[in-house]
Regions:
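Cys/His-rich metal-coordination motifs, chiefly Zn-binding "fingers/knuckles"
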Residues: 1-9
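Short pre-active-site segment immediately N-terminal to the catalytic Zn-binding motif
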Residues: 62-83, 99
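Metalloprotease/metallohydrolase-associated module, dominated by Zn2+-dependent proteases
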Residues: 20-21, 26, 30-67, 98-201
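A generic structural micro-environment signature
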Residues: 7, 84, 178-182
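Short, charged cytosolic
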Residues: 12-24, 75-82
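N-terminal hydrophobic alpha-helix used for membrane targeting or insertion
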Residues: 75-79, 95, 129-132
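Active-site recognition of the HExxH zinc-binding catalytic motif
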Residues: 79-95, 106
Length: 201
């Protein structure tokens, strides 16, 4: 009798066992993150207009190549905001005591901050906020890719008028001898940024 009861309660085969485990995993995730099963908040008309305008500004004014000599007014404003998080990244990751991580931390933090904000909006099921954070996140791919490409040409001005010895990506490419991959790496990051922006819209 005990065996019959066990056979009725246990999944009868491997396929059912897998399905059983997947359902349990899904239940555990829902229990840990109950907000993820909530419906998305609707996008208000002002938010929709703002996001559409922001997307169009990206299309018109954001760089179409990794080689630029300066920023437009719009991209300059965005870049200056990103620059705050970039410089903060050097300080933050510098606490780990690793020189390479401290150098890389500037560009890394540019991506981490909008990604964390994206996770927050996503967790709260805020559709407009999620779209905004993703556009900011992928826009930083473009910003970082331009800085990467400039590691070879050194035409962009550095903060505080620092010389080329302070160029993050010049130092990183030197350190890992990646000069033959500069163009491929920077263009890959650049196009990932643009694809992400289009998919966000």
């Amino acid at each position: 009798l005990d065996q019959l009861v066990q056979n009725k309660t246990d999944p009868p085969n491997n396929e059912n066992r897998i399905e059983f485990k997947e359902k349990n995993l899904g239940k555990k995730i829902r229990d840990l993150f109950p907000s993820l099963i909530q419906p998305w908040k609707p996008v208000t008309n002002p938010a929709f207009i703002f996001l559409t305008l922001l997307f169009l500004l990206h299309i018109v004014f954001f760089p179409k190549t990794t080689r630029i000599e300066g920023w437009s007014v719009f991209t300059g404003m965005i870049h200056n905001v990103n620059l705050v998080f970039h410089e903060a990244g050097h300080i933050l990751f510098g606490f780990f005591g690793n020189d390479t991580l401290a150098i890389f931390g500037g560009s890394l933090n540019q991506l981490l901050i909008p990604f964390v904000i994206f996770l927050s909006f996503y967790y709260n099921r805020d559709r407009a906020g999620t779209a905004f954070a993703l556009m900011w996140f992928f826009g930083n791919f473009i910003d970082v890719s331009i800085y990467m490409a400039d590691g070879r040409f050194l035409t962009l001005p550095l903060i505080g008028g620092l010389d080329m010895e302070a160029h993050d990506w010049r130092n990183l490419f030197n350190r890992f001898d990646l000069w033959s991959f500069v163009q491929a790496l920077s263009k890959t990051i650049f196009y990932l940024g643009w694809v992400g922006i289009f998919l966000t819209e």
